[in-house]
Amino acid sequence: MGPVGIILIVVAAVLVAGGFVAMLIFTTPIAKKVYRDQLVRTSPDKWGRVCSCPENEEQQAMWDAGIAWAKPRAGRKTNVEIENDGFRLVGEYYDFGHDRCAIILPGRCECLIYSYYFAAPYEDADFNVLVVDTRCHGESDGIYNTIGVKESGDVLTWAKLMHERFGNKEVWIHGICIGTSSGIFALTSPDRPDYLKGLVTEGCYVSLRETFKRHMMADKRPLFPVLDQVMWQINKHTGTNVYRQKPIRQIKKMPADCRVLFLYGKQDIFSIPKKSQKLFDACSAKDKKLMWFAKGGHSHLRINNIESYDRAIFEFFN
């Protein structure tokens, strides 16, 4: 190749590199905004104790039904709080006179009032119930969502409170979407106590990047390079590496003595069936069960299948 050819290649490389840099200059502010909108509590009112999506009829119905469940049980409620990682975290404990407790971990944007809706099947299955404002939600402290990684320490601290203060011999986790990620990291932690027994998961994703991609696709947003720029923002602000710290990888470390019930919907467009099956297959717990529901979108399985959803939980434990 002659000098002219070499010069042309160099010029082309410079133009391509320059174009890529120009693109990043344009897309970086977009990625920062997406990150702040979706995963950062930018004001005290954000992710407060309100219905996160009142325009969605099913979401509002779940909210109303949860409040209807909690109201007549107010006499069984104890307001509780813990401190972990320097954050004050709050919850409500409902004592039904049993020796085991279910901690309900809601998805992103949701507070403990949302979790009331999932408490009913546990009351019926002879559990006490703890609902919590996860960090940076409701009345709990915090700004950044760490995708379940540091929240897992919060879960372990809640479990310790349930065991030591309230005498629960067993503590179980019910996780919805990202709440399951916190549960998986807690159960696979070297600090997991013997009384933390297992998990019921609804709609858990294989990785945050995978489900975030599907949310962006549903919103008809361009993926490249914004998707991975958002993942970089997560790492920059929280230290979480979503490429390595993800449920599909962590669940392979699930202790053999844990029990896990997977609840998934065939209509879920964010935790799609093919990926959900992979998560179940990867789980190293000896006692695991997978149940599919034909109807119901992401995090909306119970409202579309109340009888069979509640029965699945009851039969898993009884």
Regions found by a protein language model. Give the residues of each.
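An N-terminal hydrophobic leader/cap segment in hydrolases
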Residues: 12-82
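The serine-hydrolase catalytic nucleophile loop
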Residues: 108-121, 134, 274
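Conserved alpha/beta-hydrolase
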Residues: 119-141
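Alpha/beta-hydrolase active-site loop
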Residues: 145-166
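Hydrolase active-site cap/lid region
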Residues: 185-242
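Conserved alpha/beta-hydrolase "acid-adjacent" motif
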Residues: 243, 269-275
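Short beta-strand/loop motif that positions the catalytic acidic residue
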Residues: 254-256, 262-264, 268
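Catalytic histidine-centered segment of alpha/beta-hydrolase-like enzymes
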Residues: 296-307
